[in-house]
Amino acid sequence: RLHMNVTYIQHSGFSVDFADMMLVFDYWMGEITIPEDKPVYVFVSHAHHDHFNEEIFEWERSGVDIRYILSDDINADPAENRILLGPDEFCDLGNIKIKTLRSTDEGVAFFVSIQTSESAQEVHIYHAGDLNWWHWEEEGTEYNQQMKEDYQNALRLMEGEHVDVAFVPVDPRLEDAYYWGIDWYMRHTDTERVYPMHMWGQYEIQDRLLCQPETAPYRERIVKVMAS
């Protein structure tokens, strides 16, 4: 049986731990233990302060096999173990293959295919970063129509994809449009488990999401999170 342990850290930060590797996405703050007995892959979707903390480069101490997969808007010193990716790129690291999608805000979203020693099947993980359906009433009709098109176009890459674990924004600041991004995503992919993120500490929005009539077809696949 595949060992895959998903841990919510804070905001949009998650770790996904396998027997033979660990992935970390958009670490901002919170408790995390970096293992020394397996490779660690650290993903950063863009440079916004709530998705990127330079502390991640301090994890690179002796004995840790670590690689950084960074959006190319991040100003990081070049190093052999740092890979910068723009939107719509593909990167093959052997047992990990990464596709990037163009964000509707800054940077990229990540679609990661993983070959672990425990499973003949690839494991697929999607982390949206700030790729979301950002509908702001105050921005007006033209902006919001463009946002809708940009979001739906970006997700065409994911159409029908089987995804084991997805991390998708559910932002309470969007008011009644808070669920539009996750709803479109879930209706256009074959995702087994989706974790809400980017909630700014307002975790009760998840209860609203679970009661939202539109989420009925996939409600049992939504995994509620709480900051540790």
What are these regions (language model features)?
Residues 30-33, 48-52, 74-78, 89-91, ...:
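Active-site environment of divalent metal-dependent phosphoester hydrolases
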Residues 29-75, 156-167:
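Active-site metal-binding motif and surrounding structural segment of the metallo-beta-lactamase
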Residues 6-12, 79-93, 178-228:
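Binuclear metal-ion centers of metallo-dependent hydrolases, dominated by the metallo-beta-lactamase
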Residues 150-156, 175-184:
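A short, acidic, amphipathic alpha-helical segment used as a generic capping/interface helix at domain edges
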Residues 36-37, 54-57, 81, 139-140, ...:
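Short amphipathic alpha-helical segments
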Residues 43, 98-100, 166-169, 194-196:
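Short catalytic-loop micro-motif centered on adjacent basic/acidic residues
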Residues 5-8, 22-26, 42-44, 64-73, ...:
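Short, hydrophobic beta-strand segments that form beta-sheet elements in well-ordered domains
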Residues 2-37, 81-162, 225-228:
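Core dinuclear metal-dependent hydrolase active-site scaffold
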